[in-house]
Regions:
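Short, cationic-aromatic polyanion-contact patches
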Residues: 2-9, 23, 54-77
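Pre-recognition alpha-helix immediately N-terminal to the DNA-recognition helix
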Residues: 10-14
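Key DNA-contact positions within bacterial/archaeal DNA-binding proteins
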Residues: 25, 36
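Alpha-helical residues within the helix-turn-helix
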Residues: 29, 46
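Amphipathic alpha-helical dimerization/coiled-coil segments
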Residues: 75-101
Length: 101
């Protein structure tokens, strides 16, 4: 069963809030999605104004990004969290009814 795009965005926002210094490769690995899909998702989130990306020098030869949720991103994550919890409660109730049969 494929995840909805909102689920991917919710998971990316959650991981970024937990660790703004996470690398794209680590984030993609943790979320079990391709690097290309993650890049697409990050561009979408940035385009919606939900995250900011800033460069910083990890060492003198390599730049890394830091990902920060904007106030709009924090509000969107809260909304997605509520929707996710409602979905899980609905699934729980359906499974509970199924088991009672």
């Amino acid at each position: 069963m494929a995840k909805k795009p909102d689920a991917d965005q919710f998971n990316v926002l959650r991981k970024i809030q937990d660790n703004p210094n996470v690398t794209q490769r680590k984030l993609a690995s943790d979320l079990e999605i391709s690097l290309g899909k993650l890049n697409y998702c990050l561009r979408e989130l940035r385009g919606k104004g939900l995250i900011k990306m800033s460069n910083f020098a990890k060492n003198k030869n390599k730049l890394n990004y830091i990902y920060l949720l904007t106030p709009k991103g924090i509000a969107e994550k809260a909304k997605l969290t509520i929707n996710f919890m409602k979905l899980k409660m609905k699934e729980y109730e359906e499974l509970k009814k199924e088991m009672e049969k």
